[in-house]
C-alpha cells in the first residue's frame, strides 16, 4: 500500500511523539527502588537482624533495651527524612525529562515541515514541465465547456454563411469578401470543434447533420444558380418594359360619342345638300323631278332628328342614307336632259362631291 507524503510525515511525527513521552517514564521507573511498607513501631521487623540476636528471650524489659530502641527510632527518623529529600530531587529530574523530549519533538516537526515544502516546490515544477498524459485527452467535457463549444460552432456557421452570401457563385464581389486566410482559419476552427464534440460523444451523427455539414467543405463551390439566383438590377433599370393598359382604350381611336357627333354632322350636311338639289329651277325639270321617285327618308330624317339621338341608331341610319343618296343621284342623272346637266354643272359636281364625301367618311364611322 503506497502512502502519500502527508501520510508519511504524520506517521513519523506520531512515532517520535510516542517515543519521547514513553522513554522518560521507563527510565524514571527503573531508577526508583522499591521501599518496604511501613509497619507498627512496636514490632521488631524495623530493626536489622542483628538486633534480634541481641534481644533477650525473656518477657521482662531491661533499661538497656529501652535505650537501644529509642536510639534506633531516632536513626530511622533521620534516615526517613533523608529518603524524603532524595525523593523530591527525583521528582524534579523527572519533570525536566518530560519537557525536554517534547521540545525536541517540536524541533523535529519544524525540520520535517521545511523539507516537505522544498519537496513540494520541486514536484510542482516537474509537473509543469512534463507533458500531459495520454489519458487526459479522452477526459469528459463539462456542460459549461459543451455550451461554449456549441456557441463557437454557431458563430462559425454564421460567419461561413455570410462569407458564402458575399462571394456568390459568379464571384462579382470577391474584392469585398474576406481573404482566403480567414476562410481557411474558419474552416479549421469548425473542423476542430466538430471533432472535439464527436470525441466526447455528445453529438450523434445522423444523415441529416452530415448533409448540413457537407456544404461547408473545401471542395464546395456554392449553390447552383437555379436555387440561388442573382439578379442584376442595373440591367432591369436600363431595359424597362413598356406598360400595357389592358382596360384603357386607344387614344387614336374615336369614342362612341365622337362617332355619333360625326354621323350627325354628316346627316345634316346631306339633308342640306338634298334640299338644295330639289329646288325647282326649270318647269321641265320640276315635272321630271315630280315624276321621278322620291326617297322619303330625308323628310323623315329632318323631322325626327330629336328622336334618333342614339349613337347606334345614327350609325345605322348613316349607312342606309349613304346608299339612298347614291341611288337618288343615279336616278336624277338619268332623268335630266343633257343640256340641263351641262348648264347645271355646278350642282351635279356638288352632288358628286357630296357623294364622295359620304363614301370617304362612311368607313370612319363604321370603324
Curated annotation (Swiss-Prot):
One GO term of the biological process aspect: positive regulation of cytosolic calcium ion concentration
Coiled-coil residues: 138-169
Residue ranges that the UniProt entry lists as topological domain Lumenal: 32-95
One GO cellular component term: endoplasmic reticulum membrane
Topology feature Cytoplasmic, residues: 117-367
Chief site of localization: endoplasmic reticulum
Keywords, sorted A to Z: Acetylation, Chaperone, Coiled coil, Endoplasmic reticulum, Isopeptide bond, Membrane, Signal, Transmembrane, Transmembrane helix, Ubl conjugation
Membrane-protein topology: Single-pass membrane protein
Comp. bias regions, Basic residues: 358-367
Signal sequence annotation: 1-31
One MF annotation (Gene Ontology) recorded for this entry: acetylcholine receptor binding
Positions of modified residues (N6-acetyllysine): 201
Transmembrane region(s): 96-116
Composition bias type Basic and acidic residues, residue spans: 271-280
Subcellular location: Endoplasmic reticulum membrane
Keyword match Protein biosynthesis: no
InterPro entries recorded: Ric3, RIC3_N
Family: Belongs to the ric-3 family.
Domain-related comment: The coiled-coil domain mediates transient homodimerization with other acetylcholine receptor-bound RIC3 molecules, promoting stepwise ACHR homomeric assembly at the membrane.
PANTHER family: PROTEIN RIC-3, RESISTANCE TO INHIBITORS OF CHOLINESTERASE PROTEIN 3 RIC3
Protein name per UniProt: Protein RIC-3
Lineage: Eukaryota, Metazoa, Chordata, Craniata, Vertebrata
Amino acid at each position: 500500500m503506497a502512502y502519500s507524503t502527508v501520510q508519511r510525515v504524520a506517521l513519523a511525527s506520531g512515532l517520535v511523539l510516542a517515543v519521547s513521552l514513553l522513554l522518560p517514564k521507563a527510565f524514571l521507573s527503573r531508577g526508583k527502588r522499591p521501599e518496604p511498607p511501613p509497619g507498627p513501631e512496636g514490632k521488631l521487623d524495623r530493626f536489622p537482624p542483628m538486633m534480634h540476636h541481641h534481644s533477650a528471650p525473656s518477657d521482662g524489659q531491661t533499661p538497656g533495651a529501652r535505650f537501644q530502641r529509642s536510639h534506633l527510632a531516632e536513626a530511622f527518623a533521620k534516615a526517613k527524612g533523608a529518603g524524603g529529600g532524595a525523593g523530591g530531587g527525583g521528582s524534579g529530574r523527572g519533570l525536566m525529562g518530560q519537557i525536554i523530549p517534547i521540545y525536541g519533538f517540536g524541533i523535529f516537526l519544524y525540520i520535517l515541515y521545511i523539507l516537505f515544502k522544498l519537496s513540494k516546490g520541486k514536484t510542482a515544477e516537474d509537473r509543469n514541465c512534463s507533458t500531459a498524459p495520454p489519458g487526459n485527452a479522452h477526459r469528459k467535457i463539462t456542460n459549461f465547456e459543451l455550451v461554449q463549444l456549441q456557441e463557437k460552432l454557431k458563430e462559425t456557421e454564421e460567419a461561413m454563411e455570410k462569407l458564402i452570401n458575399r462571394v456568390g457563385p459568379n464571384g462579382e464581389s470577391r474584392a469585398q469578401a474576406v481573404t482566403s486566410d480567414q476562410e481557411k482559419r474558419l474552416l479549421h476552427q469548425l473542423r476542430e470543434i466538430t471533432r472535439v464534440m464527436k470525441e466526447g460523444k455528445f453529438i450523434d451523427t445522423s444523415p441529416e447533420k452530415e448533409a448540413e455539414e457537407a456544404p461547408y467543405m473545401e471542395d464546395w463551390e456554392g449553390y447552383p444558380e437555379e436555387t440561388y439566383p442573382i439578379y442584376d438590377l442595373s440591367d432591369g433599370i436600363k431595359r424597362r418594359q413598356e406598360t400595357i393598359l389592358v382596360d384603357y382604350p386607344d387614344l387614336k381611336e374615336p369614342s362612341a360619342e365622337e362617332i355619333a357627333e360625326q354621323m350627325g354632322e354628316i346627316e345634316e350636311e346631306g339633308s342640306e345638300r338634298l334640299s338644295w338639289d330639289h329646288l325647282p329651277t326649270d318647269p321641265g325639270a320640276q315635272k321630271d323631278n315630280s315624276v321621278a321617285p322620291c326617297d322619303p327618308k330625308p323628310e323623315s330624317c329632318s323631322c325626327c332628328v330629336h328622336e334618333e339621338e342614339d349613337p347606334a341608331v345614327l350609325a345605322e341610319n348613316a349607312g342606309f342614307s349613304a346608299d339612298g343618296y347614291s341611288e337618288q343621284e343615279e336616278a336624277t342623272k338619268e332623268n335630266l336632259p343633257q343640256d340641263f346637266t351641262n348648264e347645271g354643272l355646278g350642282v351635279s359636281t356638288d352632288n358628286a362631291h357630296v357623294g364622295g364625301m359620304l363614301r370617304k367618311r362612311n368607313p370612319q364611322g363604321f370603324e
